[in-house]
Regions:
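ATP-dependent carboxylate/acyl-activation modules
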Residues: 1-209
Length: 209
């Protein structure tokens, strides 16, 4: 069941995982000493982010730290994030800090859904990451979408060649991407009375091996 409120990152992850979206399940940290229990040192790198439904653009206020690869850096990042948020958003309710392993991908995409006042449930897909607002290479479709419609969405992008192999590069894992678009479209269509909008940016898609 979806709570009737703005959801934080942890809540959103649980909901989207249950909807069949390929989300990495984050860990919620509420005390700096808990980092030693959860943080795994080694070759992996992690991201830490403030958890608050009151703060939309967390990177802008120093609420996100990337490439954390040891416990000392994790503890410093924890302290820095809280200080930055306290300085920039002193009235925001803070649920803690999430930590999640960083993953690499070949293309950063944006995937979202919303309830349009005219068309109803809508799913959105396009080039994401730092390019989402610059390139504006995004397409929309009424939800739910079929596999054929999801592929038409990708083919409608100006950047479509990136997904199907450009200049000798292999294509991306298209079926996993199609499933993500389809599953989110099914989710927004089934929960149009409970969900206003969902946005995931970036989602990382990888080339086929």
């Amino acid at each position: 069941d979806i709570p009737n409120k703005n959801l934080n990152e942890i809540d959103c992850s649980e909901v989207l995982l249950s909807a069949g979206l390929p989300i990495l399940k984050p860990i919620l940290i509420k005390d700096i000493e808990d980092l030693s229990s959860y943080f795994k040192e080694g070759k992996d790198k992690y991201v830490m982010k403030i958890v608050s439904s009151d703060i939309q653009h967390k990177t802008d206020i120093g609420g996100v730290v990337l490439n954390i690869d040891n416990l000392d850096l994790a503890k410093k990042s924890y302290q820095d994030i809280f200080k930055n948020v306290k300085d920039s958003a002193p009235n925001a309710h803070i649920d803690g800090i999430m930590i999640s392993p960083m993953k690499n991908g070949d293309i950063e995409c944006i995937l979202g859904a919303k309830i349009d006042p005219v068309f109803g449930p809508i799913v959105m897909f396009g080039l994401g990451g730092i390019y989402a607002e610059v390139m504006k290479d995004i397409v929309f479709a009424e939800a739910p979408v079929s596999k054929q419609k999801a592929e038409q969405m990708i083919l409608s992008l100006k950047s479509k060649d990136l997904f199907y192999g450009a200049r000798g590069k292999p294509p991306i894992e298209i079926n996993s991407l199609l499933n993500a678009i389809i599953n989110l479209s099914n989710f927004i269509a089934a929960n149009s009375d409970k969900v206003d909008q969902v946005e995931m940016n970036p989602i990382l898609v990888s080339e086929t091996e």
